[in-house]
């Protein structure tokens, strides 16, 4: 095989994302390869090679009928489920075009795959039907609202539901739905997405009034690019692809015979009662129970987002109640475990629309993990998955991500210094002195459980829980966290310590810095009379200034506060704002002044306070027009990117500059601990350091990085390392490189 293709990683892969796609079974791959090389004829050709190909095509069609229980109707081979959905929708809407009225509706389940509502909306607009596209609500268990269907299906041109949900595994009672649908509209076209039902549920489509049922091969061990569509006898049909008249004129284009051969082998397995590849449902339930046990043993506090009693056993949708989905997925990926955050086709979304429709909490929707395996999973596959999941518990406990059962907590890792904790665009800061004295600045409600666990597990002595002002965009977490940590919160914004708070060899002092709000303050962290960090709240955002659009804000007071800070801070003082809309993570006062044109103009005397206020007001108006960021707006220049290095180029750089080249892993410590980077690149101990993005500000504070060295940054995919490179470039680091594609492409 050409080296441009990826090879199996050295560690055994634990693949638990079967609802997204599956590997092709060896026996199916053999048949596909054989068809490509031997039975490669065009089914439309009249010679023997073509006749043989046609025979394979029709035999596969007959097998499909047996698998889905379709003695009648048509089986149409497609490129996949999405084409099948298009075909069903276009056929129905064209047939009902003349029936459309101002009251017509198109119904779909609120938890359907996005391919369904998007297709309905697209063709409704293109064909000019003007029907209302309505989502059928679901209850907390993900089951469709039968009453809603009864009230609206009478006006429906089409209704679309699904057999099994791809995110939660919830299955619908198709018999009960059929009764409701046909009782109120016997003629309406009904499409059922059966993609996730194939191989997991018994199907008898000819015994139903389902008009269309799309299927996909790659969700069940067949190749990508092949699927099929069941069309009920006498249901409307219009060819979606015209041309040479293949598939009896129903779908033109030379058939994907290798893919169809793959389906043939798949159907053979599904129909063979003696085969041992696909496991019985009882075995799949046992597999699920094993995975649940491993998850609960490792993570402890878990919420399952759908009732297990009404889901297929091959799908688990859950959230870890103290970890974000990104943290869980990054940890799993580092350990060679593949899962997803919801639907793979909707991975860009920050919430799950499926779980939102079910009415779960914000935390569940934002942090859902989908773990799915296929019905051909073996006992050894599941045992390895459970072993790998359970092996993560020491990593989690060592980094305070779960409650540890260690008897000597002092042996666990404690991140001394400055740590940034984030939720969406908000930042919370934890500083831990060398004697375990600690202070928390601008806590976030969503992070209270994590902060509480971290403080108690590491036996930190929290001297204060502080806010820099009363935040406009979020509820205050200060009182709640202080109560849980039994810290005095009686003072203004949590400050009740006189002039300073002692934190080991450090001191924390307070200065009033109004502008963003009238009560804004900044906290200055100093050691040996040097101010090392400034917790400035929303007076500053990285590369810009805080908003002055609130009722108690003042541009002139902001100018005075910034002038005061310029007199107190040093060039290398680390700036710690309450928001980070630019994914910047770490900034010094010097870099901040260079990045903010208006700040520089003020401090250099190019504008007075009145002129500053005028220009700041103009910037705020631009913020309102251009930015969704509530508390600040950055006008910093486009971020610089570092050179991209392949793994081979990295090795060459290490060879040529071994004394000055360092591999910098910017993943979180729990990810770093789950991957043997040193062996992967043959690194000496001094050639590898781990500074996660959450600790990049601390690296500035402690001067851990040397601008004369070459740093090759790595992470899982190259995204986080790319952000860190932009950050380091802004701080004056010239020799920084990104591992192209991250560890995923090594």
Predicted regions and their residues:
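Pyridoxal 5′-phosphate
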Residues: 1-415, 422-424, 478
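Short hydrophobic beta-strand that contains or immediately precedes a catalytic carboxylate
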Residues: 15-18, 77, 440-442, 513, ...
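Active-site neighborhood of phospho(di)ester-bond hydrolases with catalytic His/Asp-centered motifs
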Residues: 79, 109, 193, 214-217, ...
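Short amphipathic alpha-helix with an adjacent loop that forms part of the alpha/beta core around
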Residues: 145-155, 450-458, 499-504, 652-656, ...
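Accessory terminal helices/loops
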Residues: 398-421, 425, 560-662, 668-670, ...
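Catalytic core of the metallo-beta-lactamase
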Residues: 415-458, 495-588
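Active-site metal-binding motif and surrounding structural segment of the metallo-beta-lactamase
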Residues: 446-492, 500
């Amino acid at each position: 095989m050409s080296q441009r293709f990826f090879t199996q990683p050295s560690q055994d892969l634990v693949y638990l994302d079967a609802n997204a796609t599956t590997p092709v079974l060896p026996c199916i791959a053999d048949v596909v390869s054989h068809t490509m090389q031997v039975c490669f004829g065009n089914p439309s050709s009249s010679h023997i090679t073509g006749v043989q190909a046609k025979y394979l095509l029709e035999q596969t069609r007959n097998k499909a009928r047996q698998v889905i229980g379709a003695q009648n109707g048509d089986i149409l081979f497609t490129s996949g489920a999405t084409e099948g959905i298009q075909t069903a929708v276009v056929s129905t809407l064209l047939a009902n075009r003349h029936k459309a009225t101002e009251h017509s509706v198109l119904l779909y389940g609120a938890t359907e795959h996005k391919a369904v509502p998007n297709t309905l909306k697209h063709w409704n607009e293109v064909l000019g039907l003007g029907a209302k596209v309505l989502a059928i609500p679901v209850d907390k268990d993900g089951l469709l609202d039968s009453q809603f269907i009864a009230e609206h299906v009478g006006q429906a041109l089409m209704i679309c539901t699904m057999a099994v949900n791809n995110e939660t595994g919830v299955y619908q009672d198709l018999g009960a739905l059929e009764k409701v649908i046909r009782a109120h509209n016997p003629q309406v076209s009904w499409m059922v997405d059966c993609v996730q039902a194939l191989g997991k549920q018994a199907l008898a489509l000819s015994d139903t009034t389902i008009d269309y049922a799309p299927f996909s091969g790659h969700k069940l061990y067949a190749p990508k690019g092949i699927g099929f569509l069941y069309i009920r006898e006498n249901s409307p049909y219009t060819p979606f692809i015209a041309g040479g008249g293949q598939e009896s004129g129903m779908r033109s284009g030379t058939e994907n015979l290798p893919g169809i051969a793959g389906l043939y082998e798949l159907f053979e397995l599904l129909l063979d009662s003696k085969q041992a590849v696909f496991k019985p449902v009882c075995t799949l339930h046992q597999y699920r129970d094993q995975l649940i046990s491993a998850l609960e043993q490792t993570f402890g506090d878990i919420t399952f987002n759908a009732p297990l009693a009404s889901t297929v056993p091959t799908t688990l949708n859950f959230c870890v109640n103290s970890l974000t989905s990104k943290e869980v997925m990054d940890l799993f990926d580092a350990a060679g475990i593949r899962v997803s955050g919801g639907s793979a086709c909707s991975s860009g979304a920050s919430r799950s629309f499926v779980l939102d429709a079910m009415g779960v909490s914000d935390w569940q929707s934002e942090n859902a993990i989908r773990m799915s395996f296929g019905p051909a999973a073996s006992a050894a596959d599941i045992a390895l998955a459970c072993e790998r999941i359970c092996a993560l518990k020491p990593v989690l406990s060592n980094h305070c991500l779960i409650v540890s059962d260690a008897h000597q907590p002092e042996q666990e890792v404690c991140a001394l210094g400055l740590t940034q904790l984030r939720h969406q665009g908000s930042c919370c800061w934890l500083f831990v002195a060398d004697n375990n004295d600690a202070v928390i600045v601008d806590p976030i409600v969503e992070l209270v459980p994590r902060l509480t666990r971290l403080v108690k597990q590491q036996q930190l002595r929290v001297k204060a829980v502080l806010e820099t002002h009363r935040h406009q965009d979020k509820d205050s977490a200060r009182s709640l966290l202080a109560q849980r940590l039994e810290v005095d919160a009686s003072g203004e914004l949590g400050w009740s310590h006189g002039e300073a708070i002692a934190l080991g060899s450090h001191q924390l002092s307070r200065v009033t810095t109004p502008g963003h709000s009238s009560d804004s303050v900044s906290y200055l962290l100093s050691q040996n009379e040097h101010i090392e960090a400034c917790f400035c709240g929303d007076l500053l955002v990285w590369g810009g200034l805080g908003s002055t659009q609130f009722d108690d804000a003042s541009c002139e007071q902001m100018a005075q506060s910034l002038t005061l800070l310029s007199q107190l801070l040093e060039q290398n003082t680390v700036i710690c704002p309450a928001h980070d809309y630019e994914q910047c993570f770490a900034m010094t006062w010097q870099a901040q002044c260079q990045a903010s044109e208006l700040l520089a103009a003020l401090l250099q005397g190019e504008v007075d306070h009145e002129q500053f206020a005028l220009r700041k007001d103009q910037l705020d108006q631009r913020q309102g027009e251009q930015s969704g960021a509530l508390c600040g707006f950055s006008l910093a220049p486009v971020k610089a990117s570092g050179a991209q290095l392949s793994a081979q180029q990295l090795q060459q750089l290490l060879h040529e500059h071994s004394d000055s080249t360092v591999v910098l892993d910017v993943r979180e410590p729990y990810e770093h601990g789950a991957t043997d980077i040193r062996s992967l690149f043959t690194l000496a101990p001094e050639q590898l350091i781990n500074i996660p993005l959450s600790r990049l500000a601390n690296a500035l504070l402690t001067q851990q990085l040397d601008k004369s060295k070459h740093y090759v940054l790595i992470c899982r995919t190259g995204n986080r390392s790319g952000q860190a490179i932009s950050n380091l470039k802004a701080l004056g680091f010239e020799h920084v490189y990104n591992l192209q594609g991250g560890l995923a492409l090594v």
